[in-house]
Amino acid sequence: MSKIIGIDLGTTNSCVAVLDGGQVKIIENAEGARTTPSIVAYMDDGETLVGAPAKRQAVANPKNTLYAVKRLIGRKFDEKAVQKDIDLMPYSIVKADNGDAWVEVRGKKLAPPQVSAEVLRKMKKTAEDYLGEEVTEAVITVPAYFNDSQRQATKDAGRIAGLEVKRIINEPTAAALAFGLDKTEKGDRKIVVYDLGGGTFDVSIIEIADVDGEMQFEVLSTNGDTFLGGEDFDQRIIDYIISEFKKEQGVDLSKDVLALQRLKEAAEKAKIELSSSQQTEINLPYITADASGPKHLNLKITRAKLEALVEELIERTIEPCRVAIKDAGVKVSDIDDVILVGGMTRMPKVQDKVKEFFGREPRKDVNPDEAVAAGAAIQGSVLSGERKDVLLLDVTPLSLGIETLGGVMTKMIQKNTTIPTRYSQTFSTADDNQPAVTIKVFQGEREIAAGNKGLGEFNLEGIPPAPRGLPQIEVTFDIDANGILHVSAKDKGTGKENKITIKANSGLSEDEIQRMVKDAEANAEEDHRLAELAQARNQADALVHATRKSLTEYGEKLEAAEKESIEAAIKDLEDILKTGDKAEIDAKVEALSTASQKLGEKMYADMQAQQQAQQQQAADNAKPVDDNVVDADFKEVKRDQ
């Protein structure tokens, strides 16, 4: 049975792990790194770059290099958070036909799950290279505070990448799994997972208990902000640099896409450096130019300045912590451990704030970049039956309900309810002889339905004529272990029933997903073709170089016609290298190899002659050496003395 891998699909970086021989293995990618930047670049020759290669060329190709796409997944174009991102991102965010936020690259519209699928495909390939077998199943993590449509979109991304997503698991819960299974402390423990990543913030209160030899992880509550993370911290630094540069040079860099990409890179680097240093220098020569000539950017930033710039962002993480503690029904003093997850938690000011709120030092023995993928791999091993000593009880992060008379939100399932769960409630009609009801499903905490996130709607038709309030319509909400919702409505009088799996009233249709899967497969073939072409070009280059070198050394031993034939074959191969496909290059390589045979024979004959000459020389030198060594007279004299 093939392994179920664990993937942390992050906003900034992604990571893949697997349980191998009972131990969690974080798998290095082709570049040798344990995490992969969640960046996808679309090149003008049709090639798609993922990870570090995409990040390296971002400055030169900002409009076609997509990063932080997770912030758009499962979101509407008109949402306030998306509108804010449109002004900040160098790439184009557009409105899809169904109202979703999509991106546009090289004239082609792409859904965020399609872009995320490229990252997932790299994670899949990374695992396959390590395991030496095909991988088809995965557990993928999402922020705990992701709503239903964001979870659905993540699942869609997995399918497009050729993965069957066995479970969607919350990031803090995954981190708790990775932490809890390592620990030897006995007894029940309540822990807080504070997860501040590249694009999202989550906090979960989790109880770890030992129940008859089985480790039980029960999520008591969760809260967060799906639009708060390291990208926002970077943006504060970028805004500061832009304003300082404008003051000094009078030039506004915010309108220059290339400059913005360089600033993004520099801001991220400065932020990381200031976690260990008190001061850093941002030095970007030739950042822009005006009539007076090129402009250079040189700016010192202290840790204190950075902390002042992002203080309000760090403060925003504390209110969700307060709510999570209250919802869990515990006091801060009941917490045994505080676990930090996500790269942003390396910032000393963040650690200080967490310590101040929870009144205890956060644990330092959890790798903030790898814990989530490790936990996903553990959950994968539980689902495959490899581990049987772990039970995970997660919760739904937001309340779910339907719109009833007067636009009121009637909650069916309260937030922080353990999943999977099922709940039914009976409703009736609002008008006499009403033939149908529309069930509108919402997710959120507001009393008025319109203030919450609309997840979808469907009709139950064929209700027999009756006075208002008489028909009995039973509505059932069923949340599966992935946190994805299924809703049904049944007329108790007639037995008529209608049900849907909530696909956000946006989201991708089955046809769209299938089309994207086919696109992805075609891309994989194209990638394979490009890789083979690159390999053929490299081999051809090496052959040209080696033949030229040999021609310089041994060319005078060839007849003029032979030499001309080789030079012509070299020129033919060099000409075809720039434009030819693999078959054409291979044919010219073969032609050059054939033309060079005589040269090879001359080289071989020359080398043999050299070897024979060296052996003869060695034999001649050996005789006098022997005479010198065995000198009986000399030895005799020595003895007499």
Curated annotation (Swiss-Prot):
The keyword Nucleotide-binding applies. One of its GO terms (molecular function) is ATP-dependent protein folding chaperone. Gene3D superfamilies: 1.20.1270.10, 3.30.420.40, Actin, Chain A, domain 4, Substrate Binding Domain Of DNAk, Chain A, domain 1. Residues 632-641 have a biased composition (Basic and acidic residues). Residues 608-619 have a biased composition (Low complexity). It comes from the Bacteria. SUPFAM superfamilies: Actin-like ATPase domain, Heat shock protein 70kD (HSP70), C-terminal subdomain, Heat shock protein 70kD (HSP70), peptide-binding domain. Keywords: ATP-binding, Chaperone, Nucleotide-binding, Phosphoprotein, Stress response. InterPro entries: ATPase_NBD, Chaperone_DnaK, Heat_shock_70_CS, HSP70_C_sf, HSP70_peptide-bd_sf, Hsp_70_fam. Induction: By stress conditions e.g. heat shock. The modification Phosphothreonine is found at residue 200. Residues 606-641 are annotated as: Disordered. Transmembrane segments: none annotated. Pfam families: HSP70. Acts as a chaperone. Belongs to the heat shock protein 70 family. HAMAP family: DnaK. This is Chaperone protein DnaK. It comes from Bordetella pertussis (strain Tohama I / ATCC BAA-589 / NCTC 13251).
